[in-house]
């Protein structure tokens, strides 16, 4: 194996390409939630298009590939220019988090126009050389995302709103390393921003989706967030599973046959139901003990938010049952339990929005070995971001937390068709049994 290295060619702020408002914007209740103040890191892999495809030149220097315009300009330059233009529309991203002078103790966004920290980098290898960034990673996190020193970027990481790195590989592919602050955008909002960059990179006059700030229209219930949770010391093992489209289709048909032809379920429902079943059996929990799943669902439709709202609009969905019941249930039966929890979410969200929870904080979490936290990246919109080079072959979080029992659901990387589950939810003593149970019928 060779020595793989990434060189940071240039780095510094990219500012809006035109004048933007100078103001301080308040954040919504969910934006201000203590656990959201920090950068979410992800990587987005773009392969070089097939050179064997039939190409025809365009007047602007690009080419047509299979009826689509292909950008043959350097990716870093294209993304940098489009980012500057996108920041005119999404100008809060060019600011920083500060304390709200009108509401002391609350964070707000100072729209200062300082910009987004941007890095152009080059790797001395192909994407194949580093196994297309499959785990375990053959390049470090610091190689793939911006990690500026205080001298390079004086804004503290938890107060920075976005950082972007474009790393080109010798094969012609490139990787976008993204860091966005969860305090200003959930996954859907961050993907909306990056799709806007892609729209402008492809030559559209403006983003297809008009951004809406409107945090003042978001519910602000008189509910105090609970204390920050204690993190257990759980040395968890990392395991990846790919669920083929055929397997998912088979179980969807089984669920419809059991629940009724009008009832449908998603790939997400299936993979987390199977995870819940297999993990519960593998850890051999006390049959009477409660085993739990928690994931966040979009509340945009429930709360009637406008299209283009890019702040946090999520609400927790919590599923709990006795370990003995979960272990004895089929995957299809557990899909039904998950679907029922999702059905209840709208009512629970509205009760929270109206302050009718008796002071209880539904976002309060307890981290223990009996609980698994699920993050769904499969439908956020990152897989649709196109800078003129086509959609990414894979897009997902850079690292998973090895202290919290958690899993990531995402699209399987191309050319696979199906769903990938990245699990960090069992200790070493349970890992082999868990993996065997998960894979026993994935054919």
UniProtKB/Swiss-Prot annotation:
Q: Any idea which UniProt keywords this protein has? A: Acyltransferase, Transferase
**Which catalytic residues are annotated?**
182 (proton acceptor), 386 (proton acceptor)
- Which leading EC class covers this enzyme? transferase
Which phenotype arises from disrupting this gene?
Answer: Reduced seed mass.
Instruction: State which Enzyme Commission number(s) the record gives.
Output: 2.3.1.-
InterPro entries reported for this sequence:
CAT-like_dom_sf, Plant_acyltransferase
Q: Name one GO molecular function term.
A: hydroxycinnamoyltransferase activity
Pfam families under this entry? Answer: Transferase
Top-level taxon in the UniProt lineage? Eukaryota
Family statement: Belongs to the plant acyltransferase family.
Per the entry, what this protein does is: Involved in the incorporation of ferulate into the cell wall. May act as arabinoxylan feruloyl transferase. May function as p-coumaroyl-CoA transferase involved in glucuronoarabinoxylan modification.
Other noteworthy facts: The gain-of-function mutant OsAT10-D (T-DNA tagging) shows significant reduction of ferulate in leaf cell wall and strong increase p-coumarate in young leaf tissue but no discernible phenotypic alterations in vegetative development, lignin content, or lignin composition.
Q: What is this protein called?
A: Acyl transferase 10
């Amino acid at each position: 194996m060779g020595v793989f290295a990434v060189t940071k060619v240039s780095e510094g702020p990219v500012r809006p390409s035109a004048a933007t408002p100078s103001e301080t914007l308040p954040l919504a209740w969910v934006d201000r939630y203590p656990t959201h103040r920090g950068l979410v890191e992800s990587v987005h892999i773009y392969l070089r298009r097939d050179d064997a495809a039939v190409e025809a030149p365009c007047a602007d220097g690009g080419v047509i590939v299979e009826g689509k315009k292909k950008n043959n300009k350097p990716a870093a330059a294209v993304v940098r220019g489009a980012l500057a233009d996108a920041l005119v529309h999404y100008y809060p991203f060019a600011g920083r988090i500060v304390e709200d002078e009108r509401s002391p103790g609350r964070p707000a966004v100072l729209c200062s126009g300082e910009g987004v920290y941007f890095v152009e980098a080059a790797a001395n290898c192909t994407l194949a050389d580093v196994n297309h960034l499959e785990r375990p990673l053959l390049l470090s996190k610091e190689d793939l995302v911006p990690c500026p020193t205080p001298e390079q970027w004086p804004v503290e990481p938890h107060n920075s709103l976005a950082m972007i790195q474009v790393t080109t590989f010798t094969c012609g592919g490139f990787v976008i390393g993204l860091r966005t602050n969860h305090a200003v955008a959930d996954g859907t909002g961050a993907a909306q921003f990056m799709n806007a960059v892609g729209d402008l990179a492809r030559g559209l006059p403006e983003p297809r989706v008009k951004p809406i700030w409107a945090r003042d229209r978001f519910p602000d219930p008189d509910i105090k967030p609970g204390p920050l949770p204690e993190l257990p010391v759980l040395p968890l093992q990392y395991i990846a599973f790919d669920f083929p489209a055929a397997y998912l289709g088979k179980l969807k048909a089984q669920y419809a046959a059991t629940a009724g032809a009008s009832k449908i379920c998603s790939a997400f429902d299936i993979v987390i139901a199977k995870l819940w079943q297999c993990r519960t059996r593998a850890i051999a929990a006390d049959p009477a003990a409660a085993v739990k799943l928690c994931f966040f669902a979009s509340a945009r439709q429930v709360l009637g938010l406008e299209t283009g709202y890019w702040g946090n609009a999520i609400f927790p969905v919590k599923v709990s049952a006795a370990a003995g019941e979960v272990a004895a249930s089929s995957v299809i039966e557990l899909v039904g339990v998950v679907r029922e929890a999702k059905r209840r979410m709208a009512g629970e969200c509205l009760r929270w929005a109206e302050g009718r929870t008796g002071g209880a904080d539904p976002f309060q979490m307890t981290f223990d070995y009996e609980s698994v936290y699920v993050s769904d990246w499969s439908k956020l919109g990152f897989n649709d971001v196109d800078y003129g080079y086509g959609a990414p072959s894979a897009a997902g979080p850079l690292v998973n937390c090895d202290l919290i029992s958690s899993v990531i659901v995402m699209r399987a990387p191309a050319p696979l068709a199906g769903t990938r589950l990245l699990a960090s939810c069992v200790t070493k003593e349970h890992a082999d049994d868990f993996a065997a149970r998960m894979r026993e019928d994935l054919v």
